Regions:
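Solvent-exposed loop/turn segments at secondary-structure junctions
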Residues: 1, 27-31, 65-67, 81-84, ...
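Membrane-embedded segments
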Residues: 1-58
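N-terminal post-signal-peptidase region of extra-cytosolic proteins
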Residues: 6-8, 61-62, 87-92, 152-160
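Conserved beta-sheet core of the metallophosphoesterase superfamily
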Residues: 13, 22-23, 111-195
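Conserved acidic residues
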Residues: 19, 101-103, 136
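Residues at the C-termini of beta-strands that transition into short coil/loop
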Residues: 25, 63, 80, 177, ...
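Binuclear metal-dependent hydrolase catalytic cores centered on His/Asp/Glu-rich metal-binding motifs
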Residues: 33-57, 61-64, 69-107, 111-114, ...
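Active-site beta-strand termini and strand-to-loop segments that position acidic
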Residues: 68-70, 168-169, 198
Length: 199
C-alpha cells in the first residue's frame, strides 16, 4: 500500500547505486488486502508504482534490464507477485535473453523458484520452440524469516525456501529476512540488509 511506503520515501529516495536501484512489487504493494472499491484499489496500486519511479528506481514489472560493465553485461529480471494477487509472468520477464548470459532474477515470493531450474523452466513457462534462460541467481523476500525464532523454530520453517541460500542445478536462490514485517516485532530473527558480490 502506498500509505505504508510514504513514511520511508525520503530515506528510500536516497538509495543510490552505480548501475541503478532495481525493485519488484510484493503482495502488500497491491490492494489485495485493502477493503475498498476496485477503482480506489487501482489508484493506490498506480500511486505505489508512481512513487517508486519518482524515487528513481527501476521497477521491473515482468520485464528485464541490461546492466553493462565494460565489455561485460548481466540481465536483471523481475516478476510481479506470484499469488494473492497473481500477476507474475516469468516468460515475459525472461523473453529475449539469449543463452550464455548471466541472469539475476528479483522475485518477491520464493516458492516458484524450483520451476525456474534449467530442467523445468521451459516445461513450466516456455512456449513451443521458445528457449528461456534459467536465472543463475534469484533474490527473494516475503517470509521475513518468520519474524520470530525460538531455538531455531520459526513460523515459516516448513514453507519452501523460507530463509537463506539454496542451490539447485547450478542455480541459486537467496531469501532474505528483510527489514519489515507483518507486525513491527522480531524475536530471534534479526532484520537484515544483505550484500551479495558478483564476480
Amino acid at each position: 500500500r502506498q500509505s505504508e511506503l510514504k513514511p520511508y520515501v525520503r530515506m528510500l529516495s536516497s538509495l543510490r547505486a552505480k548501475d541503478g536501484v532495481y525493485s519488484v512489487l510484493g503482495n502488500h504493494d497491491y490492494s489485495y488486502y485493502v477493503n475498498a472499491d476496485s477503482l480506489t484499489c487501482l489508484r493506490q496500486e498506480q500511486e505505489t508504482r508512481r512513487q517508486e519511479w519518482q524515487m528513481g528506481w527501476h521497477l521491473l514489472l515482468n520485464e528485464h534490464a541490461v546492466v553493462h560493465r565494460g565489455s561485460d553485461s548481466i540481465y536483471v529480471a523481475g516478476t510481479e507477485n506470484f499469488k494473492k494477487p497473481a500477476h507474475a509472468n516469468v516468460a515475459k520477464a525472461l523473453r529475449g535473453i539469449r543463452p550464455g548470459h548471466f541472469v539475476l532474477m528479483l522475485q518477491h515470493i520464493p516458492t516458484q523458484w524450483e520451476d525456474m531450474a534449467p530442467s523445468r523452466i521451459n516445461l513450466v513457462y516456455g512456449r513451443k520452440g521458445e528457449v528461456l534462460v534459467a536465472p543463475q541467481l534469484t533474490l527473494s523476500g516475503h517470509t521475513h524469516a518468520g519474524q520470530i525464532s525460538v531455538f531455531g523454530l520459526r513460523p515459516t520453517m516448513f514453507a519452501p525456501y523460507d530463509y537463506g541460500l539454496y542451490e539447485r542445478e547450478g542455480c541459486q536462490l537467496f531469501t532474505t529476512a528483510g527489514l519489515g514485517g507483518v507486525v513491527p516485532i522480531r524475536v530471534g530473527s534479526t532484520a537484515e540488509i544483505v550484500v551479495i558480490t558478483l564476480k
